Amino acid sequence: MLPFIRLFSCLLLILFTALPQTLLANESINIPILCYHNFNPSVPGSMNLTPQRFESQIKWLKDNGFTIIPLKEAVEYLQGTRSSLPPKAIVITADDGWESVYTYMLPIVKKYNIPVTLFVYPETISEGKHALTWNQLKELQNTGLFDIQGHTYTHSNFKIEKKTRSPAGYAKFVTRELAGSKKILEDHLGTKITLLAWPFGIYDDYLEQEAAKAGYTMAFSIDYHTANKSYKPMSQPRFMIIQGQSMKTFVSIISGAKAKHT
């Protein structure tokens, strides 16, 4: 009888120590998702960042043991279809579709072999003065390092549009911005668009519902927190990274602190 009791005690010890710790570790993962915009060597512009600063940030992440993972892997974890992530996992995204992504970001991405998700809005592609072209987007896609996802059709301010349109007009506008832009990207790029970044970080319950109806499985804001399972699928936060933040601020962001200009 004594050997059986000892065996049973060992099994209980394994059950109440190892397993709960594993589950707790998986549940408590916080994922910093970084949001970049335009890369400009001469800086002017509130959302700009020099390529040199970007490279220094990537190098710091690499030197300090961070693993830059594809956004889709983070999404799988947040949705519960992936049980765990590498230690110190972090995600790189870039919004809008600036040509500087091709000119300045691409060489650094290749150098460090890191995955990036681009959130672009079709209205500007091949039309905007400093925007990417469809051919450039395809080149980025073909590197295997860039995943292209949605950022609505015109990058409009939903709060302003809601105030200036009738309820029916606004509903039609939202459908074009979400479902319409999704189809355009899918037709041009031949890939499934399932992720969305909210322009100006603006979202509400109605927009979240419409995004889900349009076929998006997760959407991202710029609410300056680490993403985790406590957030709704259509409002996962990101940290916006700009030149006005010092390296000390960047490090604090990665640690989960709110970003502040220093």
Regions found by a protein language model. Name each.
Residues 8-20:
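Bacterial N-terminal signal peptides
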Residues 46, 69-73, 121, 192-198, ...:
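Surface-exposed patches in mature extracellular/periplasmic domains of secreted proteins
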Residues 1-9:
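Bacterial N-terminal signal peptides that target proteins for export
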Residues 202-218:
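Short, electropositive alpha-helical surface patch
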